[in-house]
Amino acid sequence: MLRLVLAICYRALYRLHHAICLRSGNPLGHLRLVVVGSYRTGGAGKTPFCTWLAETLSAQGKRVAILCHEYAYDEAAMLREHFAAKPQVKIFTTRNRYRLAHELDRTKEFDFILCDDGFEDSRLVGATTFVLLWENAPTRLCELWPLGNARSLAKDHSSHRSGHTVEIRCNDPASKIRFVLDNITNKKDEDLRSVQGSAHYRQINIFCGIGDPNRLCNDIQEQGIAITDKIFLKDHDRCFSNKLNKALQENPQSAFIITEKDAARLDNGTGKPLPRPDNLYIARQKTIVDETLAHRILNELLNS
């Protein structure tokens, strides 16, 4: 009953916030606006797909600005590290994607503005919107947080954007996009999959603070790795580094697996990476897009 009441309150606040603060804005005058979103509260693969989009567009000679929310500081840090050698891709953090998009539009320094999330910001009109679907688009109150894992309903997005929406299914056998584990390595570049079968570690633990930790666990188990314990922190946890260091010190004979996003928090706010012990492994993901879908996306962005 409490969760139902919370869902009703959440829905009322959502509609009030959009009616007052997020009324439809003006389209950009010069640059192409792209929004990557999902109905899910987290864990849909938005940042990995943004990474793939930016790589694909920059390979075509396009200049790309990626806009992240300030709250997702770890995702911005991960993207900056990933694109450090590509000056044509710049990462920005902001609390107001709409305002920053228009500021960048006036500079004409980029060809594309790519919003990592922003699906719920109804001011971002005229965008090409890619929606990552892991289930059918939600239509009922019971699918909203905290009863479900949806932030909004399909009808909330039916009329406020004048651009084009492309829905991409991610969770069925016919999916044309896959998010797969590329490697699980420590600082010596040793892959855990090659050593976990031995008596090298007493335990193998998942330690993460991401949107969908259960999907990560399933992906790791599919690699043949038996997980001993699962420690899930909140997404974007700013105390992640301290909590992980404590766990590592208390369990030196155990292996710990974190994600790339978790690793982006390991500087503890100092800007300098902390020492990584040999028993700390980073699970790195890659995005595989079907050739037909990739061609469709490029055609949508470059020729329309």
Give the label of every model feature segment:
Residues 61-63, 109-110, 126, 201, ...:
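Short, high-confidence coil segments that cap the C-terminus of an alpha-helix
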Residues 71-177, 183-187:
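Phosphate/Mg2+-binding loops and adjacent switch elements
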Residues 139-253:
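C-terminal accessory "lid"/substrate-recognition subdomains
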Residues 233-237, 276-304:
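Short, flexible loop segments at boundaries between secondary-structure elements
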Residues 254-261:
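Acidic beta-strand-to-loop metal/phosphate-binding motif
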Residues 1-11:
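Charged, amphipathic alpha-helical linker segments immediately N-terminal to NTP-binding catalytic cores
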Residues 60, 81-86, 220-228:
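Short helix-loop-beta junction
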Residues 18-72, 176, 186, 197:
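Walker A (P-loop) phosphate-binding motif
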